[in-house]
């Protein structure tokens, strides 16, 4: 079968933050002369390097990376934008005969590329006003508590600060009587534009938490606080969505005098652990993922090699 007819083959490396996805993807890419597509909702932003744990300049020189540093923090970007750009890159790499490795921890972005986005029912303005009223009256915690009581599966993968997704999940549940998570899972099987091998990385909770601790301390040593200060000086204000992201929100809190540094760091570590738990919940619902310990490089290479050879 010719390359122009055969569906592109994608190796997708996924898992929680700090587990070692970047190193694994680079090892795979170097083994077969492949290129990497970053599926990370924060690494798309310029000037946000340390807090997003972007591959280093040296790593990006060793293996070509795509969809890193493509928009400014004050530009709108979402899963639909990512899907469009990623699919264009995949088409180009496939045309050039390159092996394609997708790596990241943003489950929604990965799902969008592999199977498209679930549109769901049209927005209901009356319902949205209802939930915005609840948000104004009871705050994010009240809205999240309502979601958790009505749709625990959605609450397990939606961040308690992500009011947009919380309201959409409640709206879909009201309109259809079915969890948005269940509908998304059904939708992902409808589109199969690629042949995909899903590799998941995970380790014990204690080891992962140690990695998160070390990653946080390393970020601070690399100048994370200065990075956030520079972003504010450049005019990227704290209300921007990327500036509300994990890590940046805590550092802004310190710079504004709302938190002392120890409080900010402790909060960052705690929230990162919670984020990792949500990532594992999201990926754990996908039966197509084969899981490996991060250190099992040779086993991962053999598994990926069989896929690339069509075995």
Swiss-Prot record:
The keyword Magnesium applies. One of its GO terms (molecular function) is tRNA dimethylallyltransferase activity. Residues 40-43 are annotated as: Interaction with substrate tRNA. Its EC number is 2.5.1.75. Pfam families: IPPT. InterPro entries: Dimethylallyltransferase, IPT, P-loop_NTPase. The record marks 106, 128 as: Interaction with substrate tRNA. The keyword tRNA processing applies. It catalyses: adenosine(37) in tRNA + dimethylallyl diphosphate = N(6)-dimethylallyladenosine(37) in tRNA + diphosphate. Its cofactor is Mg(2+). ATP binds at residues 15-22. Substrate binds at residues 17-22. One of its GO terms (biological process) is tRNA modification. Keywords: ATP-binding, Magnesium, Nucleotide-binding, Transferase, tRNA processing. Belongs to the IPP transferase family. Monomer. Catalyzes the transfer of a dimethylallyl group onto the adenine at position 37 in tRNAs that read codons beginning with uridine, leading to the formation of N6-(dimethylallyl)adenosine (i(6)A). PANTHER family: TRNA DIMETHYLALLYLTRANSFERASE. This is tRNA dimethylallyltransferase 2. It comes from Syntrophus aciditrophicus (strain SB). The lineage of its organism: Bacteria, Pseudomonadati, Thermodesulfobacteriota, Syntrophia, Syntrophales.
């Amino acid at each position: 079968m010719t390359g122009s007819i055969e569906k592109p083959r994608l190796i997708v490396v996924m898992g929680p933050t700090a587990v070692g996805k970047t190193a694994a993807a680079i090892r795979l890419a170097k083994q077969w002369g492949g290129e990497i597509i970053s599926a990370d909702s924060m690494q798309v932003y310029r000037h946000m390097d340390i807090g997003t744990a972007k591959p280093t300049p040296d790593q990006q020189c060793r293996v070509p990376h795509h969809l890193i540093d493509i928009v400014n923090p004050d530009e709108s970007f979402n899963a639909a934008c990512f899907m469009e750009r990623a699919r264009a890159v995949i088409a180009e790499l496939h045309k050039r005969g390159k092996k394609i490795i997708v790596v990241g921890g943003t489950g929604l972005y990965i799902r969008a590329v592999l199977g498209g986005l679930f549109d769901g029912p049209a927005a209901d303005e009356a319902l949205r006003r209802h939930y915005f009223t609840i948000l104004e009256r009871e705050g994010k915690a009240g809205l999240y508590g309502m979601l958790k009581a009505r749709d625990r599966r959605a609450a397990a993968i939606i961040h308690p600060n992500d009011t947009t997704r919380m309201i959409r999940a409640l709206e879909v549940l009201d309109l259809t009587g079915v969890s948005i998570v269940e509908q998304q899972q059904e939708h992902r099987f409808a589109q199969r534009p690629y042949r995909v091998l899903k590799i998941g990385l995970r380790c014990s909770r204690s080891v992962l938490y140690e990695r998160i601790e070390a990653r946080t301390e390393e970020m601070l040593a690399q100048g994370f606080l200065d990075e956030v200060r520079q972003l504010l000086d450049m005019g990227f204000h704290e209300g921007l969505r990327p500036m509300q992201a994990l890590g940046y929100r805590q550092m802004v809190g310190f710079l504004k005098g709302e938190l002392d540094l120890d409080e900010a760091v402790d909060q960052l570590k705690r929230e990162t652990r919670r984020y990792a738990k949500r990532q594992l919940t999201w990926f754990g619902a996908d039966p197509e993922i084969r899981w490996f310990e991060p250190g099992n490089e040779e086993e991962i290479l053999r598994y990926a090699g069989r896929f690339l050879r069509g075995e």
